[in-house]
Each structure stands twice: as C-alpha cells, then as structure tokens.
Design a protein with these regions (language model features):
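A short acidic Gly-Thr/Ser loop motif
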Residues: 1-2, 20, 126
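Short beta-strand scaffold segments in enzyme catalytic cores
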Residues: 4-8
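ATP-binding/phosphotransfer module of carbohydrate and carboxylate kinases, centering on a glycine-rich
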Residues: 13, 31-35, 40-179
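A short, polar/charged loop-to-alpha-helix boundary motif
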Residues: 20-32
Length: 179
C-alpha cells in the first residue's frame, strides 16, 4: 500500500494542472532513503504507509537483536495491527517503529503546512487505527518542525470516514465535481 493525499480548498478537491496535485506520498522524506515504487528514493510513502511501517519494524527488530514479541511473524501476516498490538504490549522495536514513523510524517506535514497553511489535516488508513501510538509522535514532530507563527494552529486528527466507504465516496466526489 502507498500513501495518498488530497487537498481540499473551499470544499473542492485541488487537481492542479494535470489532476495530480497533492502527491504528499512522493515528497522526499529521507534523502537517499528507501527505494520507492515510483523510482525515487526516500519518498514519504516508503516510511509512513502500512508497508513502510512494516519495513521500519523489521529494521527495529534487527537493531534490537530480535527482541520483539512479533519478530517471528511471517512477512505475509505482519501488518500494522500486529505491530500496534506488539507496541501496546511493551515491545521496544514496535514502539520505536511508531516513534520513527511519527517523526518522519510529522516533519513532512510541517513542510506541507509551511506552504499551504491548512486549518486541518485528516489522517486515514490502517496505520492511523493505532491512534495515539502514531498520532502523538506525529503531532509532536509536526509542531516541533513548524515555524512559531504556525504552531498550535493546525488540527491533526484521524478521519471518521468508514474505511469501507472511502474509495466509493472519493470516486463519487470526482464524478459529481465533473457534472
């Protein structure tokens, strides 16, 4: 999975010149970082998506010499929920994973705020279901990396949109806007 984003201004989706405005998943989050499916290195989605979180977790398991409650979970069964449960159970590798992910995501959100100054940012998807494990370090990093004039002014919150409705509602909104 990747990391999608959209920018809503005055209730309308910002499309840009060719319909691809708001590709936050492909901003450079880590110089010379992980290879992304788009061909670039260090894209935000290689760190802040469900797959990125899995990769960070495996790096943390290696760093902490396999001292993890989920270290033996097969890659095909490893997901954000398994890592979340491990973090809540006190797993140091899983907790570090959320801290690192939140730091990177928060820094990129701060950059986005600097050039767009939104009133709110809504996060959505599997990793966001972990709640404060991801939201607290993300918010802390975002605020730390903001210029003082922007601090404590942008709401960062999980979307309340049901996961099962997201794709159809997004597609419907695009059709309605074209009518």
């Amino acid at each position: 999975t990747g990391l999608g984003s959209g920018i809503i201004i005055d209730g309308k989706l910002l499309l840009g010149a060719d319909g691809f405005a708001g590709e936050l998943g492909h901003v450079c989050a880590v110089v010379n970082g992980r290879v992304c499916g788009c061909g670039k290195r260090g894209c935000l989605e290689t760190y802040a998506s469900a797959t990125g979180i899995k990769r960070t977790y495996l790096e943390m398991v290696a760093k902490y010499n396999g001292q993890s409650t989920a270290a033996n979970v097969p890659w095909s069964e490893l997901d954000a929920k398994v890592i979340e449960d491990a973090a809540r159970a006190g797993d140091i590798a899983a907790a570090a994973t959320y801290q690192i992910t939140g730091n990177i995501l928060g820094r990129c959100l701060a950059d986005f705020i600097h050039f767009s100054r939104p009133s709110s940012i809504f996060l959505f998807g599997g990793p966001v279901k972990s709640g404060d494990l991801l939201l607290v370090p993300t918010r802390e990093s975002m605020e730390k990396n903001l210029m003082p004039v922007f601090r404590n002014k942008v709401k960062l919150m999980p979307s309340e949109l049901p996961a099962s409705d997201a794709a159809i509602l997004g597609a419907s909104a695009l059709v309605w806007s074209a009518l």
